[in-house]
Regions:
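Membrane-interface capping segments at transmembrane-helix boundaries
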Residues: 237-248
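Extracellular/periplasmic helix-loop-helix junctions in multi-pass membrane proteins
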Residues: 205-221
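Hydrophobic alpha-helical transmembrane segments in multi-pass integral membrane proteins
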Residues: 132-136, 194-209
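C-terminal membrane-solvent junction of multi-pass transporters and transport-like membrane proteins
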Residues: 114, 118, 175-195
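Alpha-helical transmembrane segments
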Residues: 163-167, 231-239
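Single conserved hydrophobic/aromatic residue that forms the stacking wall/gate
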Residues: 1-10
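Membrane-embedded transport module
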Residues: 11-175
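Hydrophobic alpha-helical membrane segments
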Residues: 161, 166, 188-203
Length: 248
């Protein structure tokens, strides 16, 4: 009888959608919260990755049409891909599960993972970044030949820093929260951000012919980092407005 009962339990477990091992319905809620949070983190990764892809491909393609030197080299694109894949995955995977996802409506199993809001974000942010970069390409084309090398280095750094700040916005995509709300979240993002920033500085200052870069002075770094940070602050203002509207 014991063996038969055990076989029945095994069959029931295999046939069931959910099996409670600790006789607690709290386990179901926890599992759903983790599942929804993981799904949202995947969506955030897609938003960040596709935005970089759209901007990088479009800027290289349009730069060729303008008849300028390739704005991004192969080795520079390898660094961008490292940011896009490895570092972005590390940063977004460090986001802890949030109980807020339990307030969202259940999604259908056949829903496409790229939602309307994601498409708007990818295309909207991508278009803004592309407009900035194409303006820089036009300016670089009109520069004297001896200044082009430094200008292309600044172009590369601006491109990376735009994505750098956008990574913070992507980490809270789908919510109205501030990037600075959760200290655990901020710590994980800050660690990855430091790695990206230090890596970019090393590539620019010591990359030389391999990365087609020229060293930049301290104030140029300050101007680029501060100037591109508008990406983060616009995102913060937008989410703040959304929070105010939600309260009203």
């Amino acid at each position: 009888p014991y063996r038969r009962q055990r076989q029945m339990c095994i069959r029931d477990r295999e046939a069931s959608d959910i099996t409670l091992l600790d006789d607690s319905f709290h386990s179901i809620a926890t599992a759903v919260m983790w599942g929804r949070s993981l799904y949202k983190n995947i969506q955030r990764f897609i938003v960040f990755q596709l935005t970089i892809n759209v901007v990088a491909l479009a800027s290289v393609l349009l730069g060729a049409f303008f008849g300028t030197e390739l704005p991004l080299t192969v080795t520079q694109m390898l660094w961008v891909n490292l940011i896009m894949d490895t570092f972005a995955a590390m940063a977004l995977a460090s986001i802890p599960p949030s109980a807020d996802v339990m307030n969202e409506k259940p999604r259908k199993t056949d829903d496409f993972i790229i939602t309307k809001a994601m498409r708007k974000n990818i295309l909207g942010v991508g278009f803004c970044f592309l407009a900035i970069l194409m303006t820089l390409i036009v300016i670089i084309k009109q520069m004297p030949a001896d200044l082009v090398g430094q200008a292309l280095t600044q172009f590369f750094t601006i491109f990376v820093m735009l994505q750098f700040w956008n990574l913070f916005n992507a980490s809270v995509f789908g919510t109205n929260h501030s990037v600075f709300k959760d200290s655990r979240h901020a710590l994980g993002m800050l660690s990855v951000a430091i790695i990206i920033l230090v890596g970019q500085i090393l590539i620019v200052e010591f990359g030389g012919k391999v990365f087609r870069t020229e060293p930049m002075n301290f104030m140029t770094w300050v101007y680029i980092i501060a100037g591109t940070s508008f990406v983060l602050w616009i995102g913060e203002i937008y989410r703040w407005i959304k929070r105010i509207q939600k309260k009203d």
